[in-house]
Amino acid sequence: MNNKSFKLGLLSLFLMLSFHIQAQEGMPKGWKVGSQAYTFRLFSLEETLEKLNSIGVKYVEMYPGQKISKSGNETTDFTSITADGKAKIKALLNKDDIEAVAYGVVNASDEDLPKLFDFAKELGIGILTSESKPNQFDQIEKLCEEYQIKLALHNHPVPSYYWHPEVASRMLEGRSELMGVCADIGHWVRSGLNPVDCLKQLEGRIISLHIKDLNKFGVRDAHDLPWGTGTSNVAGVLHELHRQGFEGAFSAEYEHNWENNLPDVEESIAYFKRVAAQL
């Protein structure tokens, strides 16, 4: 390699590193972009964390029922996990330097709700993503205040209970600030709803998001595309959240190309950072 080529190579490396640093520094305050472990449901949590670490992602939302390790059958189900299982999860998170920011989508019986909050507290999880019904809200509100853990109501597509933002908005009136929503923008798109309009209706109650960019609008069986290439208006979503002063977690929930979707997740998060750096 001649001297000119060497200098050009160094310049290219410098520019790439500079862009990466600027993108990180340009992230709005309190924004944590990571992945829903369900994206990698064909793999164990151990493999999921390894995948995320390999692309520099440091936040994960766990879900109930995923195998914890490559070997063994114990899962992340809070109702059956052992002390050894929780210790294993902590060790895996520590090994890959990844923070478990949320857990869900999870519902619990009245009897199991305290166990769910205990599980989250022990693992340092600050958000429980759920579709709990309003008849549990009094108990949930007390637990949120006691544990200082947030409960985020998640929306699946129509006709699920929370498919329309008006429902969650109405049910959360007068409730603790620790209770809010996990806005799944892909399921809004499947339901024929504009994600930006939905976010406006929920301003002040948004705790976290599941981000999907879908190939079709208003179609239940639409599938994921890399962010910025589909119908979910991800850039518009980020601009609206920035306007609201939102601080919280974003989870990539990529439910397509199941066997090899890590490149799509990496491309999506790179797009997120480019948009966020310009806000």
Label each PLM-derived region with a short phrase:
Residues T48, I89, L116, I140, ...:
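Aromatic/hydrophobic pocket-lining residues that form π-stacking "cages" and hydrophobic walls in ligand
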Residues E61, A102, T129, A152, ...:
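Conserved beta-strand positions in the central sheet of alpha/beta enzyme cores
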